[in-house]
Amino acid sequence: MAIFTPELWLICFAVTVYIFDYIYTKYLMYKLGAKPITHVIDDGFFGFRLPFLITLANNQGRLIEFSVKRFLSSPHQTFMNRAFGIPIILTRDPVNIKAMLAVQFDEFSLGLRYNQFEPLLGNGIFTSDGEPWKHSRIMLRPQFIKSQVSHVNRLEPHFNLLQKNITAQTDNYFDIQTLFFRFTLDTATEFLFGQSVHSLNDGENSLQFLEAFTKSQAILATRANLHELYFLADGIKFRQYNKMVQDFSQRCVDKVLNMSNSEIDKLDRYFFLYEMVKITRNPQVLRDQCLNILLAGRDTTASLLSFAFFELALNEPIWIKLRTEVLHVFQTSLELITFDLLKTKCPYLQAILHETLRLYPSVPRNARFSKKNTTLPHGGGVDGMSPILIKKGQPVAYFICATHVDEKFYTKDALIFRPERWCEEPLIKKNLAWSYLPFNGGPRICLGQQFALTEASYVLTRLAQCYTKISLQPNSFEYPPKKQVHLTMSLLDGVHVKISNLSIS
């Protein structure tokens, strides 16, 4: 009879691996000056319960509340979870976030994002790492300087279409979030390609593009959530959606490539793609970069507008105060509305946008993966303030949504929507820096943040000029609102409002 059965060999092997990993981990901690992580949450055996808890919370529209609750109940701002036995560091500590996104930027990567997003977005600024990303950044940064994103008058034709859709629903409840996503798709495609898809016109082709772009993004989010098993989220429909979006982009690229530089120079308006052609004539590069920017250009602004309007419709005094400011600065004039005045003469408008981005950041959570054995400044030791070990390949998830409700920075009413806090001296004097990151931070900070803020400012200003009363449909929402978290965040149930009392045309 054999002394060592296959089962016994397997047990011996597992024990040997465990002992070796334990010793190696202790060696790395000693070498790098790290302490054991202070707080560990185990959801069942090896964390097998966590993925199911996350899935349940997500299906209920409560993933963000689930995540924030974990941080609020934790004694420290950084802790470790296990999911299927894999250790994952979670943090809302601004110092750790700054380390990953800036101070130790070169030590962390996007992990498998390229593989997960490539079917739709190709090799662009949001999918690439290292030298390819640096090249993209250098190429794209000049396209988002103030002079390129400050022409607010270009938004008015699209606002007229938005207003037409709203007027058709006067005194009826309707989902304005759907209109905001169409509006930002129209403005983003015009800014990028020089031609809008005009989804607010309800044309068959434009709605097909809208559906394809939206559903493809949802599948990309699933691929990201599957981590190494991303390839399981695939299929004919996914590829059809990608092809429809890419074909539109490619047609726009081909049109511009057939133009000479002299023809492009004669244009009296700025379009992203037309300027990019002066830098490169590689059709693949042009298509991929445009699609990468389109994703952010549509979703970030639509999310901001939707959550802002939800709160404005829920809080009539805030809406009245906004209208008072807008009418004082601009009266009912279109000509008076400029980029500079929106930024400098409308502090309450800007406070509303800041507060919306604080409570409802478009990208509420993100992650980085260590490229080498390294440390993060906080999370270890008795008080959780000592460095912790981050092994090569280990994921670190950071939750901006949890950082943004930290009472240390935003006082005890941090969970309440209160724009006035941004006009009060205590918050003005604070150096929020890495505790307020609606557009990420460090070298990968969002290039289009001024584009998004300008567009949102203009739309809210025009709505305040045009309408005196807005209200949410009773029993159509919960508070806090249910959230859908894909690549960006939106309201799961939409924003069903009634807008009445037209002020001006």
Curated annotation (Swiss-Prot):
Cofactor(s) the protein needs: heme
GO function terms (MF aspect): heme binding; iron ion binding; oxidoreductase activity, acting on paired donors, with incorporation or reduction of molecular oxygen, reduced flavin or flavoprotein as one donor, and incorporation of one atom of oxygen
Keyword Methyltransferase part of the UniProt annotation: no
Main localisation: membrane
One GO term describing the cellular component: membrane
Enzyme class: oxidoreductase
Family of this protein: Belongs to the cytochrome P450 family.
Assigned EC number: 1.14.14.-
Role: Together with an NADPH cytochrome P450 the enzyme system catalyzes the terminal hydroxylation as the first step in the assimilation of alkanes and fatty acids.
Membrane spanning residue stretches: 3-23
Residues that hold heme according to the record: 446
The UniProt record lists the keyword GTP-binding: no
Annotated organism of origin: Candida maltosa
Factors inducing expression: By N-alkanes.
Keyword field: Heme, Iron, Membrane, Metal-binding, Monooxygenase, Oxidoreductase, Transmembrane, Transmembrane helix
Annotated protein name in UniProt: Cytochrome P450 52D1
UniProt membrane topology term: Single-pass membrane protein
Localization per Swiss-Prot or TrEMBL: Membrane
